[in-house]
C-alpha cells in the first residue's frame, strides 16, 4: 500500500473518470461525473476493482459503501478528498472503520417504515378470494433462484396461470427469460409454457414499471400475489437496495389493494432478527421483530423495513402470510443450485485460499425444493393467513462438519482462527479470481463502537435460535419435509458443482 498523497477533488475525479472508462471498456468522454454510477451497470465485482485501484492511489482503502452513499463521481471525489484531509499521516492498515466514522450515514430504520396511507383494502371490492384454489397468480422474482422453483410448485400444486413480473424489452423476451431461468435449474417442462404470462415491468419502479392503465388491469385480473422478488447483495448498502426491496414491496401491496382484495404471500428472511437484542434467544414464528438496532447489512435492513410494511398492510386488513427462509441451498434431488450464493462462494473461495475459518457457526440452510414446496402449500391454507413461517432447517450442522466433508473429497485445507483467516483473506483474495473478493466488504467492513465485522458481531453476540416448530406443525401430515444436512446431501451438491466446473476435483 502506498503512502497517502494529497489529491484534490478535481484530481480524484479525473482519475476516476479515466479508470472507470477503462474498467467498462468505453471512452473517457462517455463518462459523466454527475451521473449515478449505477447507470453504468457497475456490479459488485467491478466496484471492488475500483476500490482496490483507489487504495493504490490514495494510500488507504475507502469503504466500498461510499460508492453508493455518494453515487456520482463528482460527489464521491469530494468525499474522498475530505477523507484524505481527515486521515492522519500515519499508515492506516485498518481501512474499514465504524459506521459513525467511515463516511456512511447512520440510518434510523424505524423512520423508513412508512406505508402510503392510500394503500388500504377498504377501498377495494371485498371478494371471497380463492385461498385454496387460486386461478390467476401474480409472482415477483420469477427470474431468480427461489422464484424459479416457486413457479414450478405453483404450476404443479395449482391449476393457476402464473403472471410473472420480468424486466425485458417485450413480452416475448420476458417469457424467454423466464423459460431460460427454469431451464438453467433443469425444472422447465414444455406444458408450463401456456400457463406462464410475462408482465414486463420493474420491481424498483413506481407501479412496478407499469402504466396506470396496465397496473389497474393487472389488479383486476389476478387473485393472489406471491412476492419473492428482491435484490440480494451482501455489499450494497440500504440506499442501493431500497428501491427494489422496500419501495417495490410497497407497490406490490398497492396492487393487492387495487380493484379487489388479493392476499399477499411475502417471502421475507430470518435476517429480520439480526439485531443483537435477539442474540442467543429462541425466536418463534409469532414473535415480534420490533428491534432494528444493530442490523448493519444493507440487505437485512431492507428486509426488516419491507416486512414491517407488510405487517402494516396486514393490520389495515389485507390478508397476508410471511415466509422467512434462511440461506437457501440447491435442489436436494439434483444438487442444482445457485453458484453465486454465499455458501458456494465461501466454499470455493476458501478452497482457493486453502483454509476455512475455525468458528462456531451453525449451517442452517434449507434446500430450495423444500422451501418452495412449503411456501406454496402453506399459502393455500386458510389458517395460514395472518401468520409467519420459519423455513429454517430444523437440524442444522456446524461449519466444522462441512469442512470435514470437504476434506473427505481429498481437498487439503486447514482451519484458522477467524482473525488469522481474515488476514489470509486480505492477503490472498486480492482480485476477482477469488470468489471471496466481492464479499470482502461484508467479511471485513467494521461496524459498531467495538469495531467488529458483521461475522464478528454474529460470533461474539451469538445468533438467535430461529424456531421452526410451528411451521413443522403446519406441515405435519404432508409429504413436505426438510432433507437432513448429511453426507448424501453434501455429495449431491458437490457432484453438481464439480460437474458444472464450478469446483475442480482435488
Curated annotation (Swiss-Prot):
Cofactor note: Binds 1 phosphopantetheine covalently.
GO molecular function term, any single one: phosphopantetheine binding
O-(pantetheine 4'-phosphoryl)serine, modified sites: 44
Cofactor: pantetheine 4'-phosphate
Swiss-Prot/TrEMBL keywords: Antibiotic biosynthesis, Oxidoreductase, Phosphopantetheine, Phosphoprotein
InterPro entries tied to this protein: ACP-like_sf, Far_NAD-bd, NAD(P)-bd_dom_sf, PKS_PP-bd, PP-bd_ACP, Thioester_reductase-like_dom
Biological process according to GO: antibiotic biosynthetic process
Ranges of residues in domain Carrier: 10-84
PROSITE patterns: CARRIER (PS50075)
Domain of life: Bacteria
UniProt cross-references to CDD domains, sorted A to Z: SDR_e1
Xref: NCBIfam families: Thioester-redct
Protein name (database record): Polyketide synthase HetM
Organism: Nostoc sp. (strain PCC 7120 / SAG 25.82 / UTEX 2576)
Lineage, top ranks: Bacteria, Bacillati, Cyanobacteriota, Cyanophyceae, Nostocales
Amino acid at each position: 500500500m502506498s503512502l497517502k498523497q494529497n489529491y484534490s477533488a478535481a484530481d480524484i475525479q479525473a482519475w476516476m473518470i479515466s479508470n472507470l472508462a477503462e474498467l467498462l471498456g468505453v471512452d473517457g468522454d462517455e463518462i459523466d461525473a454527475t451521473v449515478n454510477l449505477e447507470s453504468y451497470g457497475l456490479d459488485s465485482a467491478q466496484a471492488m476493482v475500483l476500490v482496490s485501484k483507489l487504495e493504490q492511489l490514495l494510500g488507504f482503502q475507502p469503504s466500498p459503501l461510499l460508492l453508493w452513499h455518494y453515487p456520482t463521481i463528482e460527489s464521491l471525489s469530494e468525499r474522498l478528498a475530505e477523507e484524505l484531509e481527515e486521515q492522519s499521516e500515519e499508515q492506516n492498515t485498518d481501512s474499514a472503520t465504524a459506521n459513525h466514522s467511515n463516511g456512511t450515514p447512520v440510518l434510523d430504520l424505524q423512520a423508513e417504515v412508512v406505508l402510503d396511507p392510500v394503500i388500504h383494502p377498504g377501498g377495494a371490492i371485498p371478494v371471497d378470494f380463492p385461498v385454496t384454489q387460486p386461478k390467476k397468480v401474480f409472482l415477483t422474482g420469477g427470474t431468480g433462484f427461489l422464484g424459479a422453483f416457486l413457479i414450478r410448485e405453483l404450476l404443479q400444486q395449482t391449476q393457476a396461470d402464473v403472471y410473472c413480473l420480468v424486466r425485458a424489452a417485450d413480452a416475448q423476451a420476458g417469457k424467454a427469460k423466464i423459460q431460460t431461468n427454469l431451464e438453467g435449474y433443469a425444472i422447465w417442462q414444455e406444458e408450463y409454457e401456456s400457463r406462464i404470462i410475462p408482465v414486463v415491468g420493474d420491481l424498483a419502479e413506481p407501479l412496478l414499471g407499469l402504466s396506470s392503465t396496465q397496473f389497474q388491469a393487472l389488479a383486476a385480473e389476478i387473485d393472489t400475489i406471491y412476492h419473492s422478488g428482491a435484490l440480494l447483495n451482501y455489499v450494497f448498502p440500504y440506499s442501493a437496495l431500497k428501491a427494489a426491496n422496500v419501495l417495490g414491496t410497497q407497490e406490490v401491496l398497492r396492487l393487492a389493494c387495487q380493484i379487489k382484495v388479493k392476499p399477499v404471500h411475502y417471502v421475507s428472511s430470518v435476517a429480520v432478527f439480526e439485531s443483537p437484542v435477539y442474540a442467543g434467544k429462541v425466536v418463534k414464528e409469532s414473535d415480534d421483530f420490533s428491534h432494528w438496532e444493530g442490523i448493519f447489512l444493507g440487505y437485512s435492513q431492507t428486509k426488516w423495513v419491507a416486512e414491517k410494511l407488510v405487517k402494516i398492510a396486514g393490520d389495515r386488513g389485507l390478508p397476508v402470510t410471511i415466509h422467512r427462509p434462511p440461506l437457501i441451498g440447491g435442489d436436494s434431488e439434483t444438487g442444482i443450485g445457485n453458484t453465486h450464493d454465499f455458501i458456494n462462494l465461501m466454499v470455493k473461495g476458501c478452497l482457493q485460499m486453502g483454509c476455512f475459518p475455525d468458528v462456531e457457526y451453525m449451517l442452517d440452510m434449507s434446500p430450495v425444493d423444500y422451501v418452495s414446496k412449503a411456501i406454496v402449500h402453506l399459502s393455500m391454507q386458510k389458517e395460514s393467513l395472518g401468520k409467519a413461517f420459519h423455513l429454517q432447517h430444523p437440524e442444522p450442522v456446524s461449519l466444522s462438519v462441512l469442512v470435514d466433508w470437504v476434506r473427505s473429497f481429498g481437498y487439503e485445507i486447514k482451519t484458522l482462527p477467524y482473525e488469522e483467516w481474515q488476514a489470509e483473506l486480505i492477503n490472498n483474495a486480492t482480485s476477482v479470481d477469488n470468489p471471496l473478493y466481492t464479499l470482502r466488504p461484508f467479511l471485513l467492513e467494521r461496524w459498531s463502537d467495538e469495531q467488529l465485522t458483521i461475522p464478528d458481531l454474529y460470533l461474539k453476540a451469538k445468533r438467535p435460535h430461529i424456531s421452526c416448530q410451528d411451521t413443522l406443525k403446519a406441515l405435519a401430515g404432508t409429504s413436505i419435509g426438510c432433507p437432513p444436512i448429511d453426507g448424501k446431501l453434501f455429495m449431491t451438491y458437490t457432484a453438481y458443482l464439480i460437474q458444472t466446473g464450478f469446483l475442480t476435483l482435488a
